[in-house]
Amino acid sequence: MKTYSAKPADIEKKWVVIDATGLVVGRLATVIAMRLRGKHRATFTPHVDTGDNVVVINAEKVVLTGRKRDQKVYYHHTGFPGGIKERTAKFILDGRFPERVIEKAVERMLARGPLGRKVLGNLRVYKGPTHPHEAQQPTVLDVAALNSKNVRI
């Protein structure tokens, strides 16, 4: 029997919505990355985008364990000499775009190639409880119920 290889035309992409309220960032990001990549399916094929479209709501209510909220530092460089900049997770979560913490965590769990960039385009993160994807009829994925360690209250 030959190994099954999924073709792009055979894949049915589902829409999944995840409520990030009280969820631990790293544990949430692993579930999202697995869903985006399609590794939860029996028809997973390494060179094809077999994953789902994932919508994350309430990104501002996500939790970092330990003292990471104060101690975790995100770096970026301006491109100029000595232009290294840093921001703490607390600064980002309390700022205008708290969804970037989840986006960055998932981005760093995916491959850094053409397929990884394509798969990351299937992720939509919103800081509030509403999202504009109701027409796609997304199914709710309860990440808190998967493992008791996924949620902190």
Curated annotation (Swiss-Prot):
Molecular function in Gene Ontology: mRNA binding; structural constituent of ribosome
UniProt keyword list: Ribonucleoprotein, Ribosomal protein
Transmembrane segments: none
Keyword tRNA processing: no
Gene Ontology cellular-component annotations: cytosolic large ribosomal subunit
GO BP annotations, alphabetical order: negative regulation of translation; translation
Top-level taxonomic group: Bacteria
Any Pfam family matching the protein: Ribosomal_L13
Signal peptide: none
UniProt KW Ribonucleoprotein keyword: yes
Function: This protein is one of the early assembly proteins of the 50S ribosomal subunit, although it is not seen to bind rRNA by itself. It is important during the early stages of 50S assembly.
Similarity annotation: Belongs to the universal ribosomal protein uL13 family.
Assembly: Part of the 50S ribosomal subunit.
Descriptive protein name: Large ribosomal subunit protein uL13
Organism of origin: Azorhizobium caulinodans (strain ATCC 43989 / DSM 5975 / JCM 20966 / LMG 6465 / NBRC 14845 / NCIMB 13405 / ORS 571)
